[in-house]
From Swiss-Prot:
EC primary class: transferase
Protein name per its UniProtKB record: Homocitrate synthase
EC number: 2.3.3.14
Domain (Pyruvate carboxyltransferase) ranges: 4-259
Gene source species: Saccharolobus solfataricus (strain ATCC 35092 / DSM 1617 / JCM 11322 / P2)
Cofactor: Mg(2+); Mn(2+)
Keywords in alphabetical order: Amino-acid biosynthesis, Lysine biosynthesis, Magnesium, Manganese, Metal-binding, Transferase
Catalytic activity annotation: acetyl-CoA + 2-oxoglutarate + H2O = (2R)-homocitrate + CoA + H(+)
Family: Belongs to the alpha-IPM synthase/homocitrate synthase family. Homocitrate synthase LYS20/LYS21 subfamily.
Length: 461
């Protein structure tokens, strides 16, 4: 029977993404969001690295003690006693000690023999355990380590007091069948020990390798929101939890909260989400080809592996030269506009003859319908409203601090500091005018905001 949970490493591995830095307040907010999402463990950072990481973990542990955060809190540490002491004094639930165990790492980085490495591993794990904290040992570059030595490393870690060993595919070279075989063999050779998979995505196989590791017996998958991490990152959280739900029938987090957490990390990391990103990208449940849209309108299962509502999303489709009559009719019905079959044929012909337009927005379709029918059409209020809100800040505030506060308001998609009469430009999206008004009021109520000017987006080219 498969048993699996998620360790989220956005605050540790994720912050190792080039150009990404989280403030202390952001670290705390992210930890709360991850706990609300339901991840089993939060790797809160390596406290010996810098004072801000230390302070962030301190505040996160405090929230754990108060019951606000429920996930297990993990502190990262080198196999160095001072690192362990710093993590232990923060009273984290678990210390994760890492050490490179491949011959490449032993020779080039540690300048150590295998025997010396085993001694360091045993001593530091025992030292951490003496502080009354649980220990996970990470076999860094485990995927390129001689198997017999990896068995010895795992056994040494277990005997020294670690209850978990993480096998790190540090340069992302594993492939699924080998991954499953590796974990199955380790569990067979070194029982009474739980295993994690830490899969990097250098070959684009991180999710597949994580699933294979779970099949092989791994019980914790390391992931980061939006797949952040060193180089090209590790297992993307939203992808692995969706795959676990689909393939194993296990809901390891609250799937409908993924979009919020993904957007939060997108804002704080400054790394934009590609529109075609699985699960949380703008195109994840957006259909285009006429045959596809007709199928989805008849039965969404034709072109969707799971309903978008599972992930707090909605389905939609684009209108362009690929569009068929089913999609066009449905779009006009949603707009509340009555179009005859003959008029529909004329509109569709106009759309297909203009091959340069990438997206037909609702306003474009109304213009076409008015052109064909000769009538002035009054549509229903739009289901999605996009707006640009110009913000003027108080003269005595730091604009960047206001920008950060605005970036976490629900409905805010992008925040930019600008020159001119206004200081900040905010892009927002709302399902209706009531929600738009609520977003605007939240922006106006933000500390440091003096005034706003709202412009509705009517057309995108």
């Amino acid at each position: 029977m498969i048993k699996v949970g998620i360790l989220d490493s956005t605050l540790r591995e994720g912050e190792q993404t080039p150009g990404v830095i989280f403030t202390v307040d952001q670290r705390v907010e992210i930890a709360k969001a991850l706990s609300d999402l339901g991840v089993s463990m939060i790797e809160a950072g390596h406290p010996a690295v810098s004072p801000d990481i230390y302070e962030g973990i301190k505040r996160i542990v405090k929230l754990k003690k108060e019951g606000i955060i429920t996930s297990e809190i993990v502190g990262h540490s080198r196999a160095v006693k001072r690192d362990i002491e710093i993590a232990a004094e923060l009273e984290v639930d678990r210390i994760a000690i890492f050490y490179g165990v491949s011959d490449i790492h032993l020779k080039a980085k540690h300048k150590a023999t295998r025997e010396e490495a085993l001694r360091v591993i045993a001593e530091t794990i025992s030292y951490a355990r003496s502080h009354g904290v649980k220990v996970r040992f990470t076999a860094e570059d485990g995927s390129r380590t001689d198997f017999d030595f990896l068995v010895t490393v795992s056994r040494t870690a277990r005997d020294a007091g670690a209850d978990r060993v993480s096998i790190a595919d540090t340069v992302g070279i594993l492939y699924p069948s080998k991954t499953k075989e590796l974990f199955s063999a380790l569990i067979r050779e070194v029982p009474n020990l739980e295993y994690d998979i830490h899969a990097h995505n250098d070959l684009g196989l991180a999710v597949a390798n994580a699933l294979a590791a779970v099949e092989g017996g791994a019980t914790i998958v390391h992931a980061t929101v939006n797949g952040l991490g060193e180089r090209v990152g590790i297992v993307p959280l939203q992808q692995i939890v969706a795959a676990i739900k689909y393939h194993f029938g296990i809901e390891v987090v609250k799937l409908d909260k993924l979009q919020y957490v993904s957007s939060l990390i997108e804002k704080y990391s400054g790394i934009p989400m590609p529109p075609n990103y699985p699960i949380t990208g703008d195109y994840a449940f957006l259909h285009k080809a006429g045959v596809h849209v007709a199928g989805v309108l008849s039965d969404p299962r034709t072109y969707e592996f799971m309903p978008p509502e599972t992930f707090g999303r909605t389905r939609d489709y684009t209108i362009d030269k690929y569009t068929g009559k089913h999609a066009l009719r449905d779009k006009y019905e949603k707009l509340g506009v009555k179009i005859s079959e003959a008029e529909m044929d004329q509109i569709l012909a106009k759309i297909k003859s203009n091959t340069t337009i990438r997206f037909y927005r609702d306003v474009d379709l109304l213009e076409l319908a008015e052109e064909v029918t000769g009538r002035v059409l009054k549509p229903r209020p739009p289901e999605q409203i996009e707006a640009l809100i110009s913000v003027k800040c108080d003269s005595n505030v730091y604009t960047t601090s206001v920008t950060r506060r605005l970036s976490v308001i629900n409905g805010v998609k992008e925040v930019m500091e600008i020159s001119g009469d206004y200081d900040i430009l905010v892009k927002v999206q709302a399902k209706d005018s009531n929600e738009l008004n609520q977003i605007i009021e939240s922006i106006r109520a933000t500390k440091g905001v003096r005034s706003t000017l709202t412009s509705l987006v009517l057309k995108k080219m």
